[in-house]
Amino acid sequence: MGATACGKQADTEENDTSYVAAYFALPDAVTGISRLLIKDDTAYLCCIEENGASYLASMAADGGDFQKQPIEVDDSVSLLDFAFDSTGNIWTICTDHAGSYRLNKFDESGRAVQSVALTEILEPSAISGAVRNLFLSIDAEGNICIAEKSGSTSAYLFDSSGQFLFSLHNEGNLLTTITTAEGQIGVCVGRMDYNLLTVDMKSRDWNKDTINLGTTAGLYGGTDSNFYRFDSSSLYRYSAGVQEGKHVFNWSDVGLGTSDIHLGELSDGRLMVLAASPDQTGTFSYEMAVLSQGEDERTVLSMVSLSAGPGVVQAVSDFNKTNSKYKVELTEYFPFEQNVSDEEWNNAVINLNTRIISGDMPDILDMSDLSVQVHHKKGLLEDLYPYMEKDPDIHMDDYFENVFQAISIDGKLPYITDGAGISTMLADADIISGSTGWTLPNLEEVLNTYGADSISNLSGAFFLKVMLRADDSFVDWTSGKCSFDSPAFIKLLELAGEIQNNSQNSASEELSDTYAAAYQAVLSIYHITQYRDYYHGNLEVLGLPGGNGGYHALIPEVKIGISSASQKKEGAWEFVRTLLSEEHQKSCTMLPIHKGAFETVMQAAIDGKSTWKWLYEKGKATKEDAELTKMLLSSADYVANGNQILENLVLAEAQEYFSGASSAQEAAEKMQNRVTLYINEQM
């Protein structure tokens, strides 16, 4: 057990409210949780183990006394979800190996008292053989709702005796179901933005009054508050009858995991949060945290991100959980899950740049969505090489040093990453037989020979974006000049137009038999395994087409820098250095840049225990795949530098060319003018 103070939040519901967390580990055997509910100030969990065994368990509010509940269930039956009715009975959704589904009722002692067959009630599944994604909630009157997530949402309503009444449908994608503190069943549906629907049992229809939740990554019933919403960045509480939630705390401030989150409210207002920490080498590791009001006297380190990815939030959470001297307060303009318009994004960038110009610099900057080149040129970022050299626990030989060299600008290291993907192209080796390199003319030859739609995962617009990020020859941030009207770029634009006009595939589609080559961001060994099988062992890694042959570009998982204006650089480095630890890098999503962590992650994949296994379930990663993945990571000497505003300017004019509204020359000249103006504004 551990306890860490988690400090005061800006703009919270109560400005003086702070939270402290006490942490309790769950048994290692638990690898999945489908539901957490609070009853009589005890947490009840629907647990799944790696071998497929499932059961209900309870856990006291002090984190102790984890116990399996003695309900009468055959070993062949899997529990999918559960709920309590007002008299204390337990209702569960179950399935068996034969693929039948049942709604089962147990009394408080765990004795089975009723079973309702669901197979004939549920609509036929669109995916044969797959376990159906079913959720269960019960209202204050005992009415039961079973909702299914299957692209759209189907809800099946039963009375308190288990008698089926009616069904409802909604085109939105189901996130979850809850029971609010008012005793209503809530069905959370939507796409990028979610709504909370409730059921009018009398009219047998959805209630007309819905709550627009906006960005939602999790929804949980409350006790004092009606319900809680997690948006991937912060927690909000909703009182009964209101449309707007009140901010409770930033998730990373309280040191909580960011995967598979469950939450319940105790009668005294404390919160029980169950969350998993990611780890590429195995299954989820769960931890329970009990949050209560308290004081935090640690030194605050400010950090700003336009939209912090899960890896950034998890890194901040881990630091805030374990560091006794410093606490990082992460401010985000947008939650990672939020759908943001170009106008909103541009305004946020302008706002942040205005703050920086006025001297309002945070201690730590998430550079993932900011222009590293611009901030470096203005001297706003610390060179992190001296920090690494002075740190007794960091040795350059432990890392793929080329990653730091690729990131470096003018010999200085503007940020740190923990993992990286590789932007590259792959092909059947036979299609480039006899070629001495991989250049734009080579790519054009492949397109002419095999067709402009013969490259998987590549539209013309996406090809242009990839090349803009990986090839910095068109923008010189040192001189403030660009060359989008050059013959080289016009040729690139024409090639993109050829791909765009003929492409019938996108990055979201699966491989078919028609692709001679493919673009791929290699984030895992399983990408290599998949293409090795696709090309029947005759895989050739081409790289991106360049003037001097193919090259591979790094895609940093995170980009964390220290402000040169910070008065707490020592503390800021305390946080940034955690990204380099071997233990941390086992949990990053992409390929670890620490050699020891990389080897551990590769071996886990070879043993079939990687969390990336879902990417290519029928494939088996081999030592040869690991060696090829290592070669890619260790040989990449460029870094993909994204600049969304600049990309939008270029792609807007490119679309004019793709549609035939302008020539390549005209589009390039417009790009040159617009990008030149943008660069001048940044200098």
Across the structure, where does each feature detected by a protein language model lie?
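Repeated scaffold domains used in trafficking and secretory/extracellular systems
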Residues: 30-38, 76-85, 124-138, 170-181, ...
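C-terminal capping/gating helix-and-loop segments adjacent to ligand/active sites or protein-protein/ligand interfaces
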Residues: 554, 611-680
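Extracytoplasmic/periplasmic substrate-binding proteins
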Residues: 494-574
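Helix-loop-helix "hinge/cap" segment bordering the ligand-binding cleft or interdomain interface
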Residues: 107-109, 113-115, 388, 405-506, ...
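Extracytoplasmic "Venus flytrap"/periplasmic binding protein-like
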Residues: 329-399, 517, 533
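Mature extracytoplasmic/periplasmic domains
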Residues: 245-246, 253-259, 264-265, 278-281, ...
